[in-house]
Design a protein with these regions (language model features):
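P-loop/Walker A NTP-binding module and the surrounding RecA-like catalytic core of P-loop NTPases
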Residues: 144-147, 173-394
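Non-catalytic terminal/linker segments enriched in charged/polar, low-complexity residues
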Residues: 1-175, 193, 220
């Protein structure tokens, strides 16, 4: 599935460990010293002192965080997997993709049926466009995207002299594909080491589960992953992410009740010291209207950049595909606060509001990296504009 990975490694990286708890079965791999050239973890508190007014004091949280105090840390270090020196793009098995496309079409069936019903006429006239307008609005495509698509469709019909509803449907599929095409971009891993990915979203969007799935796919693609459990508020959030860390045999940095920004700093610093390829930072769910929590997200972002000058390299927002136009509002709010680089759309299995991606493409075209249609690992796949367009129209 991850044929989009682009990795620039000139040599095989080795991992060092110190000042952390190592499980007995892996103790033989833990004797390698940490290269001090990467980062010093002795006293980074001063770096985030200026942010201590938001979300708690930075320095004490650093002292309690996963890296600096092993007794408060839940860290797991699996046997190292030596990454390949060069990773070529991997071809995804066609059968797996075909099965997923079937699930996507099934998931968007309610949306597709509404739009397909508009083509149940015998001729192409103004009534057809009126039915399409109603169908697109019901699918939560939004006023702007609906008006744009209808104008584009009429131009295509005129230029091609289309005369049947079947021909018009094909032209609409082309119009939707062209509208969604700017959202189809690859997630690039390997340009920076580590690649720091910050993940945000509202409560219940499936953020932590999505991180777990993404971790599995990254690991299978030869990437060494470190998880940062910066959701220190939700009950059992740390434990839920720890379960995914155990399943995927990756390291996790966590601290009960610690400061999320301080923990994120420690996680990035630890990843630099141990030559990890990817850091996934899980943050607490919040509504855009909770301004103090949005300020905390900004603090986490600033603190990550102090641990690594170029980080975060990706800021992803997980949105629930069932929320329709509310998802667009979330994208706008989080983008203004964090400067989003990508989206992950979940829970598209059974939604009648799949047209919201058209609204996002028209009003806030943030790339969509992944689309989820279920709970299984293989249900999270890369976004393709043509495939989504065909599934959307039924």
């Amino acid at each position: 599935m991850f044929s989009f990975f682009k990795k620039k490694l000139s040599e095989v990286l080795q991992s060092g460990r110190e000042d952390v708890h190592t499980p007995p079965e892996q103790a033989s791999d833990a004797g390698m010293p940490v290269d001090e050239a990467f980062c010093s973890l002795d006293d980074p508190a001063g770096l985030i002192q200026e942010d201590s007014a938001i979300g708690g004091a930075g320095a004490p949280a650093l002292q309690e965080s996963a890296v600096s105090t092993p007794q408060e840390t839940h860290a797991r270090f699996p046997p190292e997997q030596t990454p390949p020196a060069v990773t070529e793009p991997q071809q995804e098995p066609e059968s797996d993709r075909s099965r997923w496309l079937g699930r996507l079409k099934t998931g968007l069936k309610r949306t597709g049926n509404t739009i397909s019903a508009a083509f149940g006429v015998s001729q192409v006239d103004e009534s057809l466009y009126e039915e399409l307008e109603s169908a697109l609005l019901m699918a939560d495509a939004g006023v702007q995207a609906t008006a744009y698509l209808l104008d584009d469709l009429k131009r295509r019909v005129k230029s091609t002299c289309a005369e049947t509803p079947v021909q018009v449907r094909a032209l609409l599929a082309d119009a939707v594909t062209d509208l969604l095409q700017p959202l189809q971009k690859p997630l690039v891993i390997g340009e920076y080491t580590p690649t720091v990915i910050m993940v945000a979203g509202v409560n219940g969007a499936g953020k932590t589960t999505t991180i777990g799935k993404l971790t599995r796919h990254l690991s299978e693609a030869g990437q060494s992953v470190l998880l940062a459990a910066a959701d220190t508020f939700r009950a059992a959030a740390r434990e839920q992410l720890s379960v995914w860390a155990d399943r995927n045999m990756v390291e996790i940095v966590s601290s009960a009740g610690g400061d999320p920004a301080a923990l994120s700093f420690d996680a990035v610093a630890a990843a630099k010291a141990r030559n990890k390829h990817v850091v996934l930072v899980d943050t607490a769910g919040r509504l855009p209207t909770q301004l103090h929590l949005m300020d905390e997200l900004k603090k986490i972002r600033r603190t990550i950049s102090k641990a690594c000058d170029t980080a975060p390299h990706e800021v992803l927002l997980v949105i629930d595909g069932n929320t329709g136009q509310n998802a667009l509002a979330q994208v706008k709010a989080f983008d203004e606060a964090l400067q989003l680089t990508g989206l992950i759309v979940t829970k598209l299995d059974g939604t009648a509001k799949g047209g919201v991606l058209c609204a996002i493409a028209r009003e806030r075209p943030v790339p969509v990296y992944f689309v989820g249609v279920g709970e299984k690992l293989e249900d999270l796949q890369t976004f393709n504009a043509r495939e989504f367009s065909e599934a959307l129209l039924g």
